[in-house]
From Swiss-Prot:
Enzyme Commission number, as recorded: 6.3.2.6
Coiled-coil regions listed: none
Annotated family: Belongs to the SAICAR synthetase family.
Designated name of the protein: Phosphoribosylaminoimidazole-succinocarboxamide synthase
Keyword Ligase: yes
GO molecular function: ATP binding; phosphoribosylaminoimidazolesuccinocarboxamide synthase activity
Domain of life: Bacteria
Keyword hit for Nucleotide-binding: yes
A Pfam short name: SAICAR_synt
Catalyses which reaction(s): 5-amino-1-(5-phospho-D-ribosyl)imidazole-4-carboxylate + L-aspartate + ATP = (2S)-2-[5-amino-1-(5-phospho-beta-D-ribosyl)imidazole-4-carboxamido]succinate + ADP + phosphate + 2 H(+)
Taxon lineage: Bacteria, Bacillati, Bacillota, Bacilli, Bacillales
This protein's encoding gene: purC
CDD domains with a match to the protein in the record: SAICAR_synt_PurC
GO biological process: 'de novo' IMP biosynthetic process; cobalamin biosynthetic process
Keywords carried by this UniProt record: ATP-binding, Ligase, Nucleotide-binding, Purine biosynthesis
Originating organism: Staphylococcus haemolyticus (strain JCSC1435)
Length: 234
């Protein structure tokens, strides 16, 4: 099976089944668009297991993704999609870049979830773009933009409730979507502490990659604790 693509966190391989791919999660962690990089044994296993559980949970709540099944500790079988070059970010609580861009205090709770689009382009450092930019760049049509926003908000609603049951708060997260050969839009990539900001409901302790970004704790211990909380709900 041929290696089709290798990114910061995953490798994508072909399979013997047409329209299906094998995803391997790597033991690498990056921050700052790759400026900070380390290898951590067990990280790929944790993110694969977390994403598999969350995608199955979302499927039970009517949200379709490319996920088919978990193959091994570090591998998934997924439906082949053409990735839409957007990071769709949903924010419930202000932190990170939006506090610098718009002056919100860290911890400010938005009245309604805020959806933002970032253009997936490493050379441009993944800039924030508007709906009009998305159409101008021919990334998605107006109706597809509305579909992306609706799906992102639906995912947020389900995940906020899930995190609440784990005594956690979903601060923000980013997701990616892809299109099948017949044009259907599916949730793709992953949902894990790599792609979310998650705070303890009572102490605001991080349960996400910010422990690595800010050198405030062990990423492996943090992700393991998160996975244990997730498995307790199964």
């Amino acid at each position: 099976m041929a290696l089709l693509y290798e990114g910061k966190a995953k490798r994508i391989f072909s399979t013997d089944n047409e329209g299906q791919l094998r995803v391997e999660y790597k033991d690498e962690v990056t921050a700052g668009n790759g400026a900070k990089k380390d290898k951590m044994e067990g990280k790929g296993r944790l993110n694969n297991q977390i994403t598999s559980i969350i995608f199955e949970y979302l499927a039970h709540h009517g949200i379709a993704s490319h996920f088919i099944k978990q193959l091994s500790e570090t591998e998934q079988l997924v439906e082949e999609v053409k990735i839409i070059p957007l990071e769709v970010v949903v924010r419930n609580i202000a932190t990170g870049s939006i506090t610098k861009r718009l002056g919100f205090n860290k911890g400010y709770e938005f009245e309604a979830p805020l959806v933002e689009f970032f253009y997936k382009n490493d050379d441009l450092n993944d800039p924030l773009i508007t709906d009009d930019h998305v159409k101008l760049l021919k990334i998605a049509s107006e109706s597809e933009i509305e579909t992306l926003k609706t799906m992102a908000k639906d995912i947020n609603k389900v995940l906020v409730q899930l995190m609440d049951e784990m005594d956690l708060r979903l601060v923000d997260f980013k997701v990616e979507f892809g299109k099948t050969s017949d044009g259907k839009i599916l949730l793709a990539d992953e949902i894990s502490p790599d792609t979310c900001r998650i705070w303890d409901k009572y102490s605001d302790t991080n349960f996400d990659k910010d422990v690595y970004r800010n050198d405030t704790g062990s990423l492996i211990d943090t992700y393991t604790t998160f996975l244990n909380k997730l498995e307790e709900l199964k």
